[in-house]
Amino acid sequence: MRIDRYISKSRVIDIESTDFESAVSELLSVCDVTKERGITKKGLLADLLDREKQMTTYLGNGVCLPHARIKMKRPYMVAVGRCPKGLVYDGQPEYEGIRFIFLLLASKNARNYLFSLASLARVFQDNGHMDRLRAAIKITDFRKELKQVFAGEENKPRRRHNRFNNLILREAAKIAKGAQCTSVLV
């Protein structure tokens, strides 16, 4: 899944807060969730913090991935924050190691929610990708690296079969059939 499609430059920020709750609140402030009916920033923050108390979203490698399913029109919304000094939350020491918070908001109708979480987790496990993100000093460089890291291999242009390619393939198949070949190498 191409997560980079859901990352907007305006939702990639440097977090100024030092505690987890305020950091998530900063990320929510750059998300346009107030346009959706029945969703308040305060209620969404409470849901995210409740989920965090039940089970941590800290994945290791300096990454925290709070996520929630909400009623919204778009399938996904991703906000990313850098925390160079780590965060404080309920006295838990692992939060001090957090350097990135990826907030994933998914529509209740989104089909590939678990697949999206898995795609994000795969990137976070790759030390090469994480080193590229850590190496970006300016926020503009970080945004660029973020897009490249999440675009992955799918960022390469796809090869399309055009009429000419199809014509050559059909003619090659005819020649191969006439020569009693069992396969065609193009």
For each feature predicted by the language model, list its residue ranges:
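Cytosolic covalent-transfer regions centered on His/Cys nucleophiles
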Residues: 1-186
